[in-house]
Amino acid sequence: HKTNAYVISNGVNDSFVPPSQPPHNDKFTIVCSGRYSREKAQQQLLKAVAISKHKDEIRVILAGDGPRGSYLKALANRFDIDATFAFFSRDQMVKTLQNADLYVNTAIIEIEAIACMEAICCGAVPVICNSPRSATRFFAIGDNSLYEQYDIEDLASKIDYWFEHPEEKAERSKEYGATRRSFSQRECMEKMEAM
């Protein structure tokens, strides 16, 4: 007996919207959000920033909490990275993503990628881990939005690329913008109701 199968996202809350003005930060601000855990693999970002050509001009915000917090903080200190570790409310997360110059998704295991969808909805250009066990990689547009899993040099080169190409980053944000509507909770609920 055959049936029609549909994959419909849970969607992103409608408060995640692009800022009225692009961010103007004193440092290039990279946001990475998610539980501090092995499968989120945020150490990849810290190690990549440590070898970036622009390390001293970069600020990292690791939004989340979890069992690997102490390890990640120690790593940031060891590499002398300007890093903030915090758990944000929804309103704070929206503001943080709206002010991001880049969003990095380091997860090696991820099913739906709501955090990356939230970043895209806030206008951020993502750089995503190309893990075979993560659905997030399918959001990538273009070569400079994916890096190979655990390849720190590859991630650092993608960070440096976007740091050095702000005009292209603005254009890429517009390309991602075309996908935002499909992530809306309202849109996803309408699809479910239409089934």
What does each of the following model-derived ranges do?
Residues 141-152, 161-166:
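Conserved acidic donor-binding segment of nucleotide-sugar-dependent glycosyltransferases
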Residues 166-195:
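A charged, aromatic-enriched C-terminal amphipathic alpha-helix characteristic of glycosyltransferases
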Residues 11:
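Carbohydrate-associated surface elements
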Residues 87, 95-100:
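Short alpha-helical donor nucleotide-sugar binding micro-motif in glycosyltransferases
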Residues 23-40, 46-49, 61:
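Conserved donor-binding/catalytic core segment of Leloir-type glycosyltransferases
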Residues 108:
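Aromatic "clamp/platform" in nucleotide-sugar-dependent glycosyltransferases that forms part
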Residues 70-88:
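Nucleotide-activated donor-binding/catalytic signature segment of Leloir-type glycosyltransferases, i.e.
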